[in-house]
Amino acid sequence: MLAKRIIPCLDTIGRNVVKGTSFVNIRIVGDAKELARRYEREGADEIVLLDITASEEGRGTFVDVVTEVASELFVPLTVGGGIKNIEDVRKLLKAGADKVSINTAAVENPDIINQIASEFGSQCLVVAIDVKKRGKKSWEVYVKGGKVPTGIDFKDWIVEVEKRGAGEILLTSIDADGHLSGYDYELLECALNYSNLPLIASGGAGSLEDLYKALKIGVDAVLAASIFHFGTYTIPEVKKYLKEKGIWVRLD
């Protein structure tokens, strides 16, 4: 059994790390390189770095920012935002990313999942899925930074991305994001029932108990932003709590 992972998320606009609520009301919280280094020192298992406006604005990837952040980072780095094709993936991996995360590109051209998995291996491909609840045990997939509904049912999509060769799922509840009231646990349970891929829970972590509940359900990693950016908890505090609750985490 692998140790559960604690992953700080750095949503960026340029070199600035930002945080909002349900993907809006964005404010700057720090510098990407400085925060990545700080979280690594604290014991983060991975870092996720996302350019949150690239797809919405039709921009390319932020290779220069990735190069800067990766240059002094030794934990795995997952990078996403603005990826449109295999060449974008190649540039980001060359810049120092260990994994790439695709969302909008995967929905607009599902074949890109197969292409990336074939060219670089499933182990470096994370498919990010942003959803909003639309009924009882029903969620709709959104793209373009959570702004555009697709009409695609989440359950159908998670099954398809696994079949096409994704290596991991980063699942975000837009409804819960930034509200600090807990993950959408019903959504996480649904994902685990429909897919065998490693699952990263995202959107809504506000307490140590929130993290524990998600990991207890069976997710492989918890992603959080606000609780780390605003100093609610440190990564050592999170890991100490989880260890005491019987969750296997890596301690430095």
Swiss-Prot record:
User: Where does the record place the catalytic residues?
Assistant: 11, 130
Q: What is its EC number?
A: 4.3.2.10
Subcellular localization is given as: Cytoplasm
Q: List the disulfide bonds.
A: none
Question: Which reaction(s) does its UniProt entry say it catalyses?
Answer: 5-[(5-phospho-1-deoxy-D-ribulos-1-ylimino)methylamino]-1-(5-phospho-beta-D-ribosyl)imidazole-4-carboxamide + L-glutamine = D-erythro-1-(imidazol-4-yl)glycerol 3-phosphate + 5-amino-1-(5-phospho-beta-D-ribosyl)imidazole-4-carboxamide + L-glutamate + H(+)
Pathway stated in the Swiss-Prot or TrEMBL entry: Amino-acid biosynthesis; L-histidine biosynthesis; L-histidine from 5-phospho-alpha-D-ribose 1-diphosphate: step 5/9
GO cellular component term, pick one: cytoplasm
One Pfam family, short name: His_biosynth
GO BP annotations, alphabetical order: L-histidine biosynthetic process
GO MF terms, alphabetically ordered: imidazoleglycerol-phosphate synthase activity; lyase activity
Keyword Cell division in record: no
Q: List the keywords (alphabetical).
A: Amino-acid biosynthesis, Cytoplasm, Histidine biosynthesis, Lyase
Assembly mode? Heterodimer of HisH and HisF.
Query: NCBIfam families recorded for this chain?
Result: hisF
Q: What role does it play?
A: IGPS catalyzes the conversion of PRFAR and glutamine to IGP, AICAR and glutamate. The HisF subunit catalyzes the cyclization activity that produces IGP and AICAR from PRFAR using the ammonia provided by the HisH subunit.
Similarity remark: Belongs to the HisA/HisF family.
Name of the protein this chain belongs to: Imidazole glycerol phosphate synthase subunit HisF
What is the organism lineage in this UniProt record? Bacteria, Pseudomonadati, Dictyoglomota, Dictyoglomia, Dictyoglomales
- Name the gene for this chain: hisF
